[in-house]
Structures are given as structure tokens and as C-alpha cells.
Amino acid sequence: MLRDDLAGIRFDGNILPPPVMNVQKHTFEGADIAVIEVFPSKTPPVRYKGRIYIRTGPRCGIATYEEEIRLSEKRISGNLPFDTQPILGATIDDISTDLFQNGYLPYAIAPEIIDNNQRTIFEQMTSLRFLTKSDGPPTAMGILIAGKDPQYWIPGAYVQFLRIEGKELTDAIKDQKEIRGILPQQLRMLDELIRLNISVALEIPDYQATDIKIPDYPFKALQQLICNAIMHRRYEGTNAPVRFYWFSDRIEIQNAGGLYGQATASNFRTTPDYRNPTIAEAMKVMGFVQRFGVGIKIADKELAENGNPPLEFQFESTYTQVIIRKKI
């Protein structure tokens, strides 16, 4: 009787979506016990009587809005990631076939394979996940890598740059830019912008004939960190840009979306995960990423060698921020 009552929890409508569970009877030290095995939901968040409950240590409580977002992202990670989902309303005409053929395809596929295969360009685009199917809509990655107007379809897919003469956001703004276009264009423009804003001091050590150039920030560290922000940010459900704020004493880079998948605040340097795996793949194909999982390590190394303080990270459920302190 008790076993039937427990099994009936699955169907009483209080838990939605209905849980997948097994209820079994076992005997332990002469007494009958019921063992309930509940399997993780593939479509979180799960609600009980309209509420989402989470466990934080020994406490069980109702999830906040930010915690609900994190649970929803787990659902996405179990299905197609956003960057491979179709952009509804967009068509093949919204992708630049010239950009794809000349700026991506030769780097993604070996030349002899391109020469020998008989695929149409649309079949090639589908194979490389720029289209959902040869006559279907483009994917988010296709729009971001080779779209004619990516910000029309994904409004937050740009970088907001501010150069501030002071330590507070309310201080005078020396320069401001919105870095738009496809992601490869953004990354190239950001490289140039970083080089223009780095200050280089000259030191002449005793008994040496050559000057030593010491930048206030190492270029490679900033390059890796802004690339990480663009690669790992959340594009869906937000119109927030990547924020690249250059203060007089520090740089702040903030992107939408908290840590994803198996990455946590304690293991993100050694156990990365990818919210946008096909965008990450595309950035690797085009040479913006040499190896996966080493961006933060490169930044750490460059900053240490240049004499900058260690990176400071802030992880929230809705955004991630890194602070790079100026060389003292």
C-alpha cells in the first residue's frame, strides 16, 4: 500500500514535469523499507506546486530568479546549445556566402576534401553548422560568424568599450566605442583597440645600451580575456553587450551568463565547459584560439611576468566579470 502511494507521487500533478523514479521494497535488519530512486530531470527547472526548490548545503529553499536561470541553462546543455539552434525568421540570404567560402571554409576543411566533394555551398554550410539544413534557417553561430547583419538578429552581440579618466564609472569618459559586426571583425578591431590603449613606459637600466619597454598591461593577457568573454557569454535571453571598461587603475570585462556546465568557481581554470561549443570551434578554426582551456592560464602567466596583480573574478548567475589591475 505504501509502495503504491509513493509511486503515485509521480502522477499526482504536484511535480512538473513528472519525475522519473523507481520505488522498490527491500528488507533491512528484519524490517521492510521503501527505496525511492529519482533520476535527474532532462528539462529543469522542476516545480513542486508551482515552486522551484533547491538545496544549499543543509538548507532547502525556494530558488531565486538567478538560480532559476542557472537551472534553465542546464536544460539547454542537455539539448542543442543555443549557438546551433535556428534563428527564427532568418533565411539563407542573411548569411554571406562569400564570407563563408573565403573566410571560413578553407580553414575548416582540408583543400583536397573541398576539391573532391560535390556538395553545394548550402550543404557545406549545413555540414559546418552554419545552417540547420540546406534549405533551412541559419544557426546562431552562422549569423554571428558570417551574417550580413548579426546585431539585427542577436542585438546584444557586440562589445561596449569605455575609456574612463578615473576610477569610477561616473568619471569623465575619454573614449567610447561600440564594436559591432560579425565576431571575427569584432576580435580584429579589439586587437587594434587594445594596442592603441596600452601605455608603454621606457626604462634604461644601468650599464645597458637598449631601452626596456614595459606596458601597463600585457597585450596577450587582454586579448585572451576579451576573447574568452565573447566565446563564453550567454547570447540568448539578453540584450546586454560584453562590457570592456578601461579605468585609470584597472580594466573590467563583463559578459552575460555565469559559469556553465561543470565549471565552478573553484575549478574553472582546470575544468572549462562550453556554453557555445560551435562558436568556440569557429574561433579555433579562424585562428583566434590556439588551444581550448588555456586562455586564463596564458593571461595569468603574462600578467605575472609583466608585474601586474593577479586576476580577480566575480561569478554571478547572470554574469561573469574579471578585473585586471594596472601594473604598479
Q: Model-derived features: where do they sit?
A:
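Conserved N-terminal catalytic/coupling substructures associated with nucleotide/phosphate chemistry
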Residues: 1-221, 226-328
